[in-house]
A protein has these predicted regions:
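Catalytic/RNA-binding core of pseudouridine synthases
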Residues: 1-246
């Protein structure tokens, strides 16, 4: 390609498919760009998750913090009535055993997910709206003494990450077909949808984990206008770059 690496700059909206990491998506894009072009992303999507991955190219990488700080919208499916070690579908289901946590201080006694009504699930979901303290999943990229928490857990360590302040602007229960709850969540930086699934299940006394996750919006960028990763070419990549504003 003829364009010098120094001239390419902007934001690129990608619709990440399930089954690949955000880092792998970045590598695919880098192969289409001039050698030496900087490429980063503004917010990791787990391998099982799909949707909007905002890539920052060239000088736009300087705006990473600003883009990561923008509001994000997710569509998610939560399965109530069971848990997994990773709070998502990437580990085996286990029966839920109630335990004393901040999320269970006012929880109902253990029960079956099938017994829950739409209104009960919705009321539980609404308790996570606002500025809340959220305990990140142990299987996360957050570092503990320089090592990713997930790597420490896989090595056999017991990790209990401290709750952190996050903001959930809105949460909507779209459908409840026991044991699956379909939700839409609008949130700020650092919010773990997996943790909301986990804590909602604990609050309702049945356990819960995330089965599907799709990011649909970051700031003003929407997944409906994003390029599919398998349809990327050098030409459509360049014409699809959006300017990065400070």
């Amino acid at each position: 390609m003829n364009e010098p690496a120094t001239q390419l700059s902007g934001l690129l909206a990608i619709d990440k498919p399930a089954g690949i990491t955000s880092a792998r998506a970045v590598e695919r894009v880098k192969r289409l760009l001039p050698r030496g072009t900087k490429v980063g992303h503004a917010g990791t999507l787990d391998s099982f998750a799909t949707g909007l991955l905002v890539l920052l190219i060239g000088k736009a990488t300087r705006q990473c913090e600003a883009v990561m700080g923008q509001r994000k919208t997710y569509e998610a499916t939560i399965k109530l009535g069971a848990i997994t070690e990773t709070d998502d579908p990437e580990s085996a289901e286990q029966p839920f055993v109630p335990r004393e946590t901040p999320a269970t201080q006012h929880a109902v006694p253990a029960r079956r997910a099938d017994d829950l009504s739409f209104d009960e699930v919705d009321r539980g979901l609404q308790t996570f709206v606002g500025e809340i303290m959220q305990r990140p999943p142990a299987y996360s990229a957050l570092k503990v003494q320089g090592v990713r928490a997930a790597d420490r857990v896989r090595a056999g360590e017991s990790i209990a990450l401290a709750p952190r302040p996050v903001t959930v602007y809105a949460a909507r229960l779209v459908a409840w077909d026991a044991p699956l709850a379909r939700v839409v969540i609008d949130c700020g930086r650092g919010t773990y949808i997996r943790a909301i699934a986990r804590d909602l299940g604990e609050l309702l006394g049945v356990g819960g984990f995330l089965t599907e996750l799709r990011r649909t919006r970051t700031g003003s960028m929407e997944v409906s206008a994003a390029l599919r990763l398998d349809a990327l070419s050098r030409d459509n990549l360049i014409v699809s770059l959006q300017p990065a504003t400070a």
